[in-house]
Curated annotation (Swiss-Prot):
Heterodimer of a catalytic subunit (MsrP) and a heme-binding subunit (MsrQ). Belongs to the MsrQ family. The chain crosses the membrane at residues 10-30, 42-62, 75-95, 110-130, 147-167, 169-189. Its cofactor is FMN; heme b. Keywords: Cell inner membrane, Cell membrane, Electron transport, Flavoprotein, FMN, Heme, Iron, Membrane, Metal-binding, Transmembrane, Transmembrane helix, Transport. This is Protein-methionine-sulfoxide reductase heme-binding subunit MsrQ. InterPro entries: Fe3_Rdtase_TM_dom (IPR013130), MsrQ-like (IPR022837). Part of the MsrPQ system that repairs oxidized periplasmic proteins containing methionine sulfoxide residues (Met-O), using respiratory chain electrons. Thus protects these proteins from oxidative-stress damage caused by reactive species of oxygen and chlorine generated by the host defense mechanisms. MsrPQ is essential for the maintenance of envelope integrity under bleach stress, rescuing a wide series of structurally unrelated periplasmic proteins from methionine oxidation. It comes from Pseudomonas putida (strain GB-1). GO terms for molecular function: electron transfer activity; FMN binding; heme binding; metal ion binding; oxidoreductase activity, acting on diphenols and related substances as donors. One of its GO terms (cellular component) is plasma membrane. Pfam families: Ferric_reduct. NCBIfam families: PRK05419.1-2. The gene is msrQ.
Length: 203
């Protein structure tokens, strides 16, 4: 296994936040509605992990270090794990496992549908995030995994629909997402290694 300590660090970070939030909930530190706080934090955690995952390719091109790419799949699976926990928190703490209430929730809060579409996209990416799928799909695998940008867009829309008026935090996530999208433009992506070489010569 390459870069085991880097992988371990990501695993620890991925586990640490939910564990800390559970501790806060157990100690009654999350206010009068800890279930909602947990749900919101898990959703933001998933969006953060998604943006970090999308940073890996630009970082590899800028630094030439292959470790960024090695952990990309692991980070992507953490995105999926946080989203699953986010959904479970919603079902248990908000919906109370009252399935009859779900239709009412979907009518009142259509952003849930947007979030569900994002989850389905992540599910496809998680299922095909393995070497077997890469071999089976061939060149189509890369095209399929561009779906991650649609997932990012749906996640940002879901977040925007929830916050509505206070856009300060949302704007930070959206700006980072926009920068990452610009870095995907072929002309820009091809220029990243040249930037890295120029920096190396300057040093």
């Amino acid at each position: 296994m390459r870069y085991p300590w880097f992988r371990l660090a990501i695993f620890v970070v991925g586990c640490l936040f939910p564990a800390w939030w559970l501790y806060e909930a157990a100690m009654s530190l999350l206010g009068p509605d800890p279930g909602k706080i947990m749900m919101d934090r898990l959703g933001l955690g998933a969006l953060t992990f998604l943006l970090v995952t999308l940073c890996m390719t630009p970082l590899q091109k800028l630094t030439g270090w292959s470790g960024w790419i090695v952990v990309r799949r692991q980070l992507g699976l953490w995105v999926f794990a946080y989203i699953v926990l986010h959904i479970l928190a919603y079902l248990f703490f908000i919906l109370g496992l009252d399935w009859g209430q779900l239709a009412v929730e979907l009518r009142k809060r259509p952003y849930i549908i947007v979030g569900a579409l994002g989850f389905l996209g992540l599910l496809v990416l998680a299922i095909t995030s393995n070497r077997y799928s890469q071999r089976r799909l061939g060149a189509r695998w890369k095209k399929l995994h561009r779906l991650v940008y649609a997932v990012l867009g749906l996640g940002l829309l879901h977040f925007l629909w929830i916050v509505r008026s206070d856009l300060r935090e949302w704007s930070i996530y959206a700006l980072i997402g926009a920068v990452l999208m610009v870095l995907r433009i072929p002309a820009v992506a091809r220029g990243l290694p040249r930037v890295a070489r120029a920096r190396g010569r300057a040093v």
